[in-house]
């Protein structure tokens, strides 16, 4: 007979897994206390690196069932979640996600659901990258500068270029402006590329 386990995770110590436990009970699952793993750890940590999840994997056997309230309990992103579900499926452990109607993620329908979710996540990631690149290009076109401010203002940079053209050493110029040689070399390189 299949044993039923539950994995509940929250990100901070101020949060509680109580709502997740109640949701699992309301769905009709009576989880024994020793089969309920509760963890306070950031969702940005891969499931394979979470102490509680590792303990859960050590306790589970072929034919067991794992219940989670939401997919994000199983990993930090779509790829991590898929890897976790595949790892569990390879051990013949079924995974049910209540937020997806209790579908078994290791079944054909569950795998299809996972593929759709992965595709949507990839699409969202691509859109975010596209918007980021577009925003950077727009900012550059309006003259926005990126990075930290220059150590030397425009007037100082013009003086540095004049000193370089006069044959004064880079080290002497750096000492004069109380800055690094690298800063003076950057001013020189910027002047040469203009």
From Swiss-Prot:
The entry sums up its family as follows: Belongs to the site-specific recombinase resolvase family.
Describe the location of the Resolvase/invertase-type recombinase catalytic domain by residue ranges: 3-143
Q: Could you mention a single GO BP entry for this protein?
A: DNA integration
Residues of the active site are 11
Quote the InterPro entries the UniProt record gives: Homeodomain-like_sf, Recombinase_CS, Resolv_N, Resolvase-like_N_sf, Resolvase_HTH_dom, SSR_resolvase
Task: Enumerate the GO terms in the molecular function aspect.
Answer: DNA binding; DNA strand exchange activity
Please share what else the UniProt entry notes about this protein: Tn2501 is a cryptic class II transposon found as part of the lactose transposon Tn951.
According to the entry, DNA is bound by residues in 170-189
Keywords on record = DNA integration, DNA recombination, DNA-binding, Transposable element
Q: What is the protein's known function? A: Resolvase catalyzes the resolution (a site-specific recombination) of the cointegrated replicon to yield the final transposition products.
Record protein name field: Transposon Tn2501 resolvase
């Amino acid at each position: 007979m299949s044993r039923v386990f539950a994995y509940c995770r929250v990100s901070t110590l101020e949060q509680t897994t109580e709502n997740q436990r109640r949701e699992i009970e309301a769905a009709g699952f009576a989880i024994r206390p020793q089969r309920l793993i509760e963890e306070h750890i950031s969702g940005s940590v891969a499931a394979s690196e979470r102490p509680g999840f590792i303990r859960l994997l050590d306790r589970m056997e072929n034919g067991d069932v794992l219940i989670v309230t939401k997919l994000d309990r199983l990993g930090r992103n779509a790829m991590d979640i898929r890897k976790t579900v595949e790892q569990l499926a390879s051990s013949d452990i079924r995974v049910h996600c209540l937020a997806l109607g209790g579908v078994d993620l290791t079944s054909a329908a569950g795998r299809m659901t996972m593929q759709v979710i992965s595709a949507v996540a990839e699409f969202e990631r691509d859109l975010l990258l596209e918007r980021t690149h577009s925003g950077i290009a727009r900012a550059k076109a309006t003259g926005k500068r990126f990075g930290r401010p220059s150590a030397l203002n425009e007037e100082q940079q013009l003086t540095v270029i004049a000193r370089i053209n006069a044959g004064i050493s880079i080290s002497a110029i750096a000492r004069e402006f109380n800055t690094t040689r690298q800063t003076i070399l950057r001013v020189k390189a910027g002047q040469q590329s203009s």
